[in-house]
Amino acid sequence: MKVTILASAILALINGALALPANTPTLDVTLTQVDNTRIKATVKNTGNEKVTFVHLNFFQDAAPVKKVSLFRNGTEVEFTGIKRRLLTEGLSDDGLTTLAPGGTFEDEFDVASTGDLTEGGTVTIRTDGFVPITTDRKVSGYIPYQSNELEIEVDPAKAAAVPQAIKLLDRRTKVASCSGSRASALSTALRNAGSLANAAASAASSGSSTRFQEYFKTTSRRPENVGGRFRAVGREASSQSSGKTTYYCNDPYGYCDSNTLAYTLPSSNLIANCDIYYSYLPALTSSCHAQDQATTTLHEFTHAPAVYSPGTDDYAYGYRASTALSASQALLNADTYALFANGSPLLPLSNHSKCRNTMVWRTLL
């Protein structure tokens, strides 16, 4: 086992790059090996104030979410767990963690349960990103986190004996287990997501370069992979009887909860909506950078590598955190695509007048 202590130095670079206030809290993540592929993460609040943050899609989440990235010979090992989109307001307490200054918590998990490590050998593990912080159960900002780089030697026999977190379901038609009002809602969401994606593709290719840079953090002429990903989402959303993904109206794996809108299983290109997708979200929002069914569906489609490869990750949620990412992270951040699709005044589906100059919305999500 080899541990490289990079967290403090990299967090300092992150804080400088984002021009965060000097007293901005950060989370320091220390990864250690427990036994073979079983890993312990110790998360510490290095700031001088108490923070409450969303621990879903992060350490302490009991679901098979992506807590770390695994690399073998410089290539990332495919993640076989779930990626989910969360509420940004009205969050329940069971999705929140509070840490006092200097406070810590630990989380143990087995990386072989969400990644094929049966080849054994040297595997490098690390993680970084932003965790949403909350005020009165509403996301009000973000806190950066960064881990050390942990190098482990994997025993292939032991790795093969670790049960996979998710057992694949039988393949079905593109839209599965849908009927009644949910089928109607999903049909509308797919149609709207397709229209938003196609309009966003045009905005990315020939719209404002300033707006493009605002979201994707690059001054180069709109990388083709942005417009290409939006166009691919538009194609995938255009048919409910064929396509490259399987879309469930309900929760086939049991990973929905009171804070989860929908989730994607990238390794099988499966998407599932949760109950609050229907009960909480409008079909289309009239508010700048707010959540709705259409952009949630668009968000999930970007996770699926069969739609456009590589699939996106969840480096950050919401406008403030997503526009604080580096260019390389923003280009692979699912919420960046959802926010760009919602936040462009070129898009025809809902009232986006509040987003006509999104640069003034830095205080929003």
From Swiss-Prot:
Disulfide bonds join C178-C249, C256-C274. Binds 1 zinc ion per subunit. It is found in: Secreted. InterPro entries: Fungal_M35_metalloproteases, MetalloPept_cat_dom_sf, Peptidase_M35. Its EC number is 3.4.24.39. It comes from the Eukaryota. One of its GO terms (biological process) is proteolysis. Belongs to the peptidase M35 family. Secreted metalloproteinase that allows assimilation of proteinaceous substrates. Shows high activities on basic nuclear substrates such as histone and protamine. May be involved in virulence. Zn(2+) binds at H299, H303, D314. It comes from Aspergillus fumigatus. This is Neutral protease 2 homolog mep20. The gene is mep20. Residues 1-19 form the signal peptide. The keyword Secreted applies. Glycans are attached at N73, N351.
